[in-house]
C-alpha cells in the first residue's frame, strides 16, 4: 500500500487539481479519466501523460509502462514534472489550504496486527480475526459494511458515501472503505481517530481500545479482493459461510464499468450489495429480477437498489440485523 504519499482527492476532483495551476504533470492509465483533462491541461503548464496503449488521448504525451521497465518509466515521468516546474505561472497558482488528517493503509495483515494488539498473548491465539468476531458475537459491533465505488457527477458528490458511513458507525457498524469512497471518508474526517466520537457506544469503545478510526482505508477500488480475503478469514475463524456473516457491500454513487465487475464479485462471493444509483438494466425485467433476487439462489446474496439515501442505509442495517438472526446455525451472532 502507498507509503508517505498523501491523497489529493478522488475522481471528481481531477480537474480541480489542474485548476490549482500547481500541477506539473497529471498521469493516467486506463480508468476514470475525464476527457477534458487534455484541453484543460493546455490552459496551464501541466503535462498530461497517458501510460497505456489502449487509452491514448488527444493533447496527451504517451509514455508506455512495461512491467520490465516500470521503474525507469516512472523516473522519466517524475523528471518531466521536475523539469516543467520552471514553467509554472505564479499568477495562476491557487493551492487550497484545506487539509484533513487520515489514518490509512489497513490491509488484511495490518488489521490482524491491530487485533493482535488487543489480545492476551498468554491465553488468546494471535494472527486471527477472532477478537473482531468476539466483538460481533457480543453485539458490541453489529456488523460491517464494505463501502466501495465512485463519485457520480449525476448526483451530489461524496454526500451519499459520507452520510451512509456516519449512520453506520452511529449504529455500531464498522466501515471498510476503498477507492473514491475511502477518499470521501478521509476528506470528511471519518478516517481520523477522533471520528470515534461519532460512533455508537460499542464501536467507540472498540476504536479506543484498538486505536483505530471507525472507517478503515483498505486501498483502491480494485483492491476489493482485500475485503473479500478479510471476509473469508472472518468466515473461516467463525466456522460460517461468507453469506452468513453480518456484512454487506455498498456502492452508493457507482459510475465506472469496473464498479459492475466489483459489485458482481461481491454478490458472487455471497455478500448482499446495495446501490444508490440505478443500474442500466431497466430495459429487461428478467435481468432486474435476476440481479435483485435470482442470484440469491446461487450465492445467497443479491443487489438492492434504493436511490433515497436514508432508505438505503436503513435497508443495509436491516439486512445486517437479519444476518445476525437468520439461522439457528449461528445464533451466537445475535
Question: How should each PLM-predicted stretch be described?
Answer:
Residues 226, 255, 260-264:
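Redox cofactor-anchoring modules in respiratory/redox and cofactor-processing assemblies
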Amino acid at each position: 500500500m502507498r507509503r508517505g504519499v498523501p491523497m489529493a482527492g478522488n475522481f471528481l476532483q481531477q480537474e480541480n487539481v489542474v485548476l490549482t495551476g500547481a500541477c506539473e504533470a497529471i498521469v493516467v492509465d486506463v480508468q476514470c479519466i475525464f476527457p477534458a483533462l487534455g484541453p484543460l491541461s493546455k490552459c496551464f503548464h501541466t503535462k498530461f501523460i497517458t501510460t497505456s496503449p489502449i487509452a491514448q488521448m488527444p493533447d496527451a504525451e504517451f509514455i508506455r509502462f512495461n512491467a520490465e521497465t516500470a521503474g525507469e518509466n516512472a523516473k522519466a515521468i517524475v523528471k518531466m514534472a521536475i523539469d516543467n516546474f520552471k514553467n509554472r505561472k505564479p499568477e495562476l497558482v491557487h493551492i487550497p489550504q484545506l487539509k484533513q488528517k487520515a489514518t490509512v493503509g489497513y490491509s488484511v495483515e495490518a488489521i490482524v496486527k491491530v487485533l493482535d494488539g488487543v489480545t492476551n498473548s498468554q491465553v488468546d491465539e494471535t494472527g486471527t480475526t477472532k477478537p473482531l468476531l468476539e466483538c460481533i458475537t457480543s453485539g458490541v459491533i453489529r456488523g460491517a459494511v464494505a463501502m466501495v465505488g465512485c463519485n457520480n457527477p449525476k448526483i451530489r458528490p461524496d454526500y451519499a458515501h459520507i452520510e451512509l458511513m456516519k449512520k453506520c458507525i452511529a449504529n455500531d457498524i464498522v466501515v471498510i472503505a476503498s477507492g473514491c469512497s475511502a477518499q470521501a471518508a478521509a476528506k470528511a474526517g471519518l478516517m481520523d481517530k477522533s471520528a470515534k466520537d461519532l460512533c455508537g457506544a460499542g464501536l467507540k469503545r472498540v476504536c479506543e481500545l484498538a486505536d483505530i478510526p471507525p472507517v478503515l482505508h483498505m486501498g483502491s477500488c480494485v483492491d476489493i479482493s482485500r475485503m473479500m480475503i478479510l471476509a473469508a478469514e472472518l468466515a473461516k475463524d467463525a466456522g460460517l459461510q461468507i453469506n452468513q456473516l453480518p456484512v454487506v457491500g455498498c456502492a452508493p454513487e457507482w459510475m465506472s464499468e469496473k464498479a459492475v465487475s466489483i459489485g458482481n464479485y461481491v454478490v458472487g462471493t455471497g455478500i448482499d450489495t446495495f446501490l444508490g444509483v440505478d443500474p442500466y438494466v431497466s430495459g429487461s425485467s428478467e435481468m432486474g429480477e435476476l440481479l435483485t433476487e435470482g442470484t440469491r439462489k446461487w450465492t445467497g446474496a443479491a443487489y438492492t437498489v434504493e436511490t433515497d439515501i436514508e432508505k438505503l442505509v436503513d435497508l443495509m442495517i436491516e439486512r445486517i440485523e437479519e444476518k445476525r438472526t437468520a439461522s439457528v446455525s449461528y445464533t451466537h451472532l445475535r
